[in-house]
C-alpha cells in the first residue's frame, strides 16, 4: 500500500538541484510484550533520529535516505488518553487502576481514550511520510485499508463507517463492532503512534472507558 506511489524529491544545495528517490523500505521490529512507556520512549527516539537526518540533509550535497520503522508489540493492561481527549471518559478513579492491574498515560497522539492489553496487536509506524505522501487523511485511510485487507485474508468482512476513523466488523449493520482503533501524531511529516488491532484481547477492560 505504501509503495504504490513513486515520486522524486528535489533539494537545493548551493546552486545545484539534487533529485533523489525517496526510501520506501520499511524496517519491521517485533517487540513482543513490552510496557507502554518503553515503546513510547522508543518511538520518540526513532522520530528524533529521523528528524536529525532530515535536518542534516538540508545542508549536504549527498542526501541520506530517511528510515521508516514499523514496530509491532503487545502491552500489559494500559489506558492511554490522547491530547484532545476527555479524562472523564476514564470511568474510574486512577487509584482504582492497580486493582485491575492496569496503568494510565496521557500522551501526545490524536484521539480520545483507548485500551491496550495482551491479545491486542499494536502497530507503531515511524515513517517519514515524505517518502510516501504528505497527506495525513490519506495516511489514516491507508492504515485502515491495511487492516481491512488483513481481516479479509482471515475471512472477516470489515470496513469503515463514514465520518469516523477506525475499522469495524459488521460495519454496515445496526450493531457494528470496532476491531481496530487509530491515533497518530506527525511532526515534520514524521509519524508516530498508530493502531490497536483487537485479535484476542480481554474486551472487559473496555467497560472502564468510553472508547474512541
PLM features: residue spans?
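N-terminal lobe of the biotin/lipoate ligase/transferase fold
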Residues: 19-176
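Catalytic cores of processing enzymes, dominated by hydrolases/peptidases
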Residues: 177-212
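Short hydrophobic targeting helices and cationic amphipathic motifs
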Residues: 3, 8-9, 17
Amino acid at each position: 500500500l505504501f509503495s504504490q506511489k513513486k515520486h522524486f524529491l528535489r533539494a537545493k544545495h548551493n546552486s545545484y538541484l539534487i533529485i533523489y528517490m525517496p526510501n520506501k523500505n520499511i524496517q519491521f521490529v517485533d517487540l513482543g510484550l513490552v510496557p507502554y512507556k518503553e515503546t513510547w520512549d522508543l518511538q520518540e527516539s526513532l522520530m528524533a533520529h529521523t528528524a536529525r537526518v532530515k535536518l542534516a540533509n538540508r545542508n549536504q550535497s549527498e542526501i541520506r535516505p530517511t528510515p521508516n520503522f514499523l514496530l509491532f508489540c503487545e502491552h500489559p493492561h494500559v489506558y492511554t488518553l490522547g491530547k484532545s481527549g476527555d479524562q472523564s471518559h476514564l470511568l474510574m478513579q486512577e487509584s482504582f487502576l492497580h486493582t485491575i492491574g492496569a496503568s494510565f498515560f496521557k500522551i501526545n497522539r490524536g484521539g480520545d481514550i483507548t485500551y491496550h492489553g495482551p491479545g491486542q496487536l499494536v502497530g507503531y509506524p515511524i515513517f517519514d511520510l515524505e517518502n510516501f505522501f504528505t497527506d495525513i487523511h490519506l495516511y489514516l485511510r491507508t492504515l485502515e485499508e491495511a487492516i481491512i485487507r488483513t481481516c479479509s485474508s482471515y475471512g472477516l468482512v470489515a470496513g469503515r463507517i463514514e465520518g469516523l476513523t477506525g475499522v469495524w466488523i459488521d460495519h454496515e449493520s445496526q450493531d457494528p463492532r470496532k476491531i481496530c482503533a487509530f491515533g497518530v501524531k506527525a511532526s515534520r511529516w514524521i509519524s508516530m503512534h498508530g493502531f490497536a488491532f483487537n485479535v484476542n484481547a480481554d474486551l472487559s477492560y473496555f467497560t472502564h472507558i468510553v472508547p474512541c
